[in-house]
C-alpha cells in the first residue's frame, strides 16, 4: 500500500512539474509518445523535441524508480513493473500504449 501511494504521488509530480516547450500532456494527445508496461515513455514521432522530452522524462522516472525502490527495500524491477501498469491503465482515450504483444494501440 505504501509503495502504491508513493508511486501515485511520484506519477502526479511527473505530470505537474514538467515545464518544457512540449509538455507531456501535449505529446500524449498529439500521438507523439506512448506509455509502456515497463514504466518508460517511448517516442512514436522521431523529431528532436519529442525525443528530448522522452529522454528527460525517462531520466526523471529512472531516478524516481531507484529512489522508491531503495526507500521501500524492493527491487527497481518491481517498481518499474508497478509504474508501467499504472501508467498504461491511466492513459486517456486517444493516447497510445504498448500492448503486451508489443504493438502500439490507441486507447478507447
Report each predicted region and the residues it spans:
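Sec/Tat signal peptide C-region and signal peptidase I cleavage site
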Residues: 16-21
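Amphipathic, charged alpha-helical segments and their helix-to-coil junctions
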Residues: 22-56, 76-108
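Short, well-ordered alpha-helical segments
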Residues: 53-69
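N-terminal hydrophobic targeting signals that begin at the initiator methionine
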Residues: 1-2
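Generic anion/oxyanion-binding catalytic loop in active/binding sites
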Residues: 10, 50, 68
